[in-house]
Swiss-Prot record:
Subcellular localization: Nucleus; Chromosome
Keyword list, A-Z: Chromosome, Developmental protein, Differentiation, DNA condensation, DNA-binding, Nucleosome core, Nucleus, Spermatogenesis
A Gene Ontology term for the protein's cellular component: nucleus
Recorded name of the encoding gene: PRM1
Record organism: Notamacropus parryi
GO MF annotations in UniProt: DNA binding
InterPro entries recorded: Protamine_P1
Protein name (record): Sperm protamine P1
Length: 61
């Protein structure tokens, strides 16, 4: 029984990870569509340096 429970939790975590990745891409797309609204506190805390670098690079262009 314990073994089944463990495998079940493992598959659940895997599904959650895939879903999280999808939501991240979706949020990224939404930011481009609505830059003013999009700016969410959760996205800002996650990968803040990466966004800053991309912004600097875009400004140079």
């Amino acid at each position: 029984m314990a073994r089944y429970r463990h495998s079940r939790s493992r598959s659940r975590s895997r599904y959650r990870r895939r879903r999280r990745r999808r939501s991240r891409y979706r949020s990224r797309r939404r930011r481009y569509r609505g830059r003013r609204r999009x700016r969410s506190r959760r996205g800002r805390r996650r990968g803040y340096s990466r966004r800053r670098y991309s912004r600097r690079r875009r400004r140079r262009y």
